[in-house]
Amino acid sequence: SVIRTMKSIEDSDFEIPGEFRAILRGYQKTGFRWLKTLDACGFGGILADDMGLGKTIQVISLLYDEQKAEEKKPSLIICPASMVYNWESEFERFAPSIKVCMVAGTAPEREAAISHLAECDVAVTSYDLLKRDIALYQKQQFRYQVIDEAQYIKNPMTQGARAVKAIQSECRFALTGTPVENRLSELWSIFDYLMPGFLYTYDKFKKRYESPIVKDQDEEALGRLQRMTAPFILRRLKSDVLKEL
């Protein structure tokens, strides 16, 4: 039934927030509804649109919509250091009413920012700083957790990947233009962050999917994996949405 829900996203009754109706393109409105549908069903997902198709604004529209929730909790965005201030300026541009807290700067500045997260709507930090500050986040509970350039956690054994997975959040999303760059274990690691256990332990995943697909070119195993993960990955290419650009 989840799959059925996912397939009827175009007709879903999630209203696009008024401020975004004129800004979002058609496929971005579908993206907003897709994120809302996954959240409502208790799942996370990978927004894997091509570069330049506005993954950021689709997430901002989701976070803006959360403003009307009765019990508000802050959300957390984790991205490469080079993108931190890009996120800040996109919020200022599209949703200036959202109170954004930048967890950056010196260690004391970051500690002060983290201790005041309850006063913010959204916190933004980098993978590197999250890794250093992870102990300070232990008491924090987030509504949404969004990782940008999710290939940063493609190796599940790194401190960065472990830090991201240690954060407590109600709903998790990942943004990436390349869900799998080189190895299927990268996809496993992103799903291990989104919905731990959904693709089993890594050993079991390797036995069931990775080894048969990579070593034996097993089409049936590949088909099973695609069917299992498809509802949780939304990827549009520029060529798919040319007429809307």
Located regions from the model:
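ASCE P-loop NTPase motor core, strongest for the SF2 helicase catalytic module
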Residues: V2-Q217, R224-L245
